[in-house]
Amino acid sequence: MPARGKISVLIVDDSGMARAMLRSIFEDEDDFDVVAEAVNGREAIEMVRHLRPGLVTMDLEMPEMGGLEAIEEIMCSKAVPILVVSGVADAQKAFGAMSRGAVDVVAKPNVTSAREVEDFVDKARLVAKIPVITVPRTRSAPAAGPTPVPQAPPPPAAPPAGDGGIIAIAASTGGPQALAALLAAIGRPLSCPMVVAQHISDGFASGMADWLNSISAMPVRLAAEGERLTAGTVYLSPSEWNMSVTESRHIALALRPERQVYRPSCDALLTSVAQVAGRRAVGVILTGMGSDGVAGMEAISKAGGTTLGQDEGSSVIFGMNAIAIERGWVQRVLPLAELAASLLEITGASVGAAP
């Protein structure tokens, strides 16, 4: 039984060395209690049923049953918060795990790096606090949140963004799932480019871009220095760099400061889009912890652009979007399921038109 008041943890990994490393990290913290270890997905399923841990750390490549199958079985029977702890080589598969119900993805920490260990522990604490629900066994598309409540649309705050506009999106915890649902719901190329800053562990952005590209009707790619923005394309910022858009509408990547808390910076991206696109800038702030992106939404709002925010009911973490809403920088607060239609409207597309 876990100690009272502590987060009970089940570690799932076929590597004894990896399990020992994770156990050591958790045992150094006062608020975690490792209750069991499993060497494959099949063992993990049985242990979850009997122990009901507060957190499962899940590897992906294991004998007998891998992490993907185990996650799907756990989330459709005895749902618990699952944090995928994976190597960068499994990045695309790791994001596939999120479509099966895993809460988040993190790289296996280097125990010689105090910063990596601290980031890992903070992520584990956050994931353990996120409510999860049992989900259907079969998913044909990423979950798009609850059924939207009909609302009368407010008058547009800016002209259609399709001609010279840029959509800039800020996201953190829960963002990969939200982005997947949003892109799937848009379902067609937009008439302007989309740039995205999603907080993510180093090395995983490329895998996330590949995963989103498999879902989206628009090409999704990892942003590259000097690349010119193209309408109907989604550009994802690497975590190791802060992305911005230049006056000539090219991508600029600046090496992030070592002690930067949020990686990559949402504020840097959104602020640059406000400066470049002005009234035709569209800022979207999705689910996530912290305040990164709030200043960027302020910049877009003050430039006369259009600002959208994901509502509390469809957010995994109502944090950065909540702050932007409270400060008055979000003109339209919408459930995740309504954001796609709003973006189609803003960019001048007809929601009912064929692609």
UniProtKB/Swiss-Prot annotation:
Protein name: Protein-glutamate methylesterase/protein-glutamine glutaminase 3
Major site of localization recorded for this protein: cytoplasm
Reported modifications of this chain: Phosphorylated by CheA. Phosphorylation of the N-terminal regulatory domain activates the methylesterase activity.
Catalyzed chemical reaction(s): [protein]-L-glutamate 5-O-methyl ester + H2O = L-glutamyl-[protein] + methanol + H(+); L-glutaminyl-[protein] + H2O = L-glutamyl-[protein] + NH4(+)
Protein family (similarity comment): Belongs to the CheB family.
Location relative to the cell: Cytoplasm
Residue numbers annotated as active site: 172, 199, 292
One GO MF term attached to the UniProt entry: protein-glutamate methylesterase activity
Organism of origin: Paramagnetospirillum magneticum (strain ATCC 700264 / AMB-1) (Magnetospirillum magneticum)
